[in-house]
C-alpha cells in the first residue's frame, strides 16, 4: 500500500513538471545570453539613428512638387507639400534624420527677390545650429540655378547645401523626383560635401551652383556644366572629382542678414536691329543695374552701346554677358573706357544675381568688376 502511494506521488510530480514546462512562454525559456543579444540589437538600432546626419528639407514648389498622372509636360507645379515629398521616399530614413519645412509652394518662375531673402536667411539660421548637418532645397528647375547661386554667395557656412528639382511631376509615370531627392539627402549628409559651396543634384550628377545651367526644356539630364564639368557623381557611393576655386559661402563678402530688399537689376537681350530705347526704359522703370545678354563676346550694337552709356551716366551699372550659353566675356576697348563691365563666365541670369548683391555694397565699377572676376 505504501509502495502504491509512493508510485502515485512520483507520477503526479512528473505530470506537474511536464505541464509547467509546456506553459512557459518563449520569452521565459530564452537564455540570459539570448536576452543580452536581443537588447544589443535594439540598442544598436537606436545608436544607428543617432549616428545618422540630420538634414532639413526646405521646399519651395516646382515640378518636383507637381501633379499629373500621365503627362510629363502638362501639369500643375507647386501642389504637393513637403511632408508628402518626404513620405514618398521612405528610404531616406535609412541614410538621414529628415524633416521638412514649406517655405513657399510655387513654380520657380514666381520665385522673387523677397523669397530669395527669406530662403537665404532661413538656410543660414538652420545651418548655424549644431543639430543640423546639411540642407536640401527642393525647387523648380526653370530658375533653380539662380537660387542656388544666390545661396552660394550669401550663406556663411561650410555645411552642405544641396538644391534639387525634377523634370517630371511627382505623380507621373517614371518620375525622377524621388531618386533626385534621395540623392540630394545623401549628398547633404556626406562629410565630403562640406566646403564645396552650394551644390545642385539631379540625374545622378553633382554640379557647382557657380557653373551649372539648365540646357534643355524637357530632358532629365538638362543640368550641365559644359565648360567646367560636374564636380561629382552618385552611384552606390558619392564620388567627388573636381574642386571650386571661386569664392563662395563662408568666404563670401556678401551678407543679407540686415537686408529686406534687393536692388532692381534687369536683363536686356541683344539682337539684330536692336536699339537704345530698352536701356532708357529700364532706367525709367527704376533699374539700378542692367545685365546685357550680348551676342558673341558680350557685344553691343552701336545703338545699344549708346543706350548703355546713357544709363551709366545716370548712375546705373551695366554688365555685359553673353547669349551664347558658354564662354568668358572679356573686358576690352571702349567697353572698359565707358565702364561697361564684363560678367566673366557668368551667364546673364547669374550675372544679375551677383550684380544685385554687389550693389548692396558699392557702386564703384572697378570694385564690381573685381567681384565678377572673383566670384
Stretches with model-predicted labels:
Residues 20-21:
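C-terminal motif of bacterial Sec signal peptides marking the signal peptidase cleavage site
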Residues 34-35, 39-124, 306:
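ATP/NTP phosphate-donor binding region
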Residues 137-159, 300-309:
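Short Gly/Thr/Asp-enriched flexible loops that form oxyanion-binding sites at enzyme active sites
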Residues 43-44, 49, 277, 302-375:
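ATP/nucleoside-binding phosphotransfer catalytic cores, i.e., glycine-rich phosphate-binding loops
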Residues 52, 58, 65-68, 81, ...:
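Accessory alpha-helical/coil subdomains and C-terminal extensions
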Residues 148-178, 185-189, 313-322:
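Short, acidic/small-residue loops that bind anionic groups at enzyme active sites
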Residues 1-10:
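Bacterial N-terminal signal peptides that target proteins for export
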Residues 164-235:
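Internal gly/pro-rich beta-alpha loop/helix module
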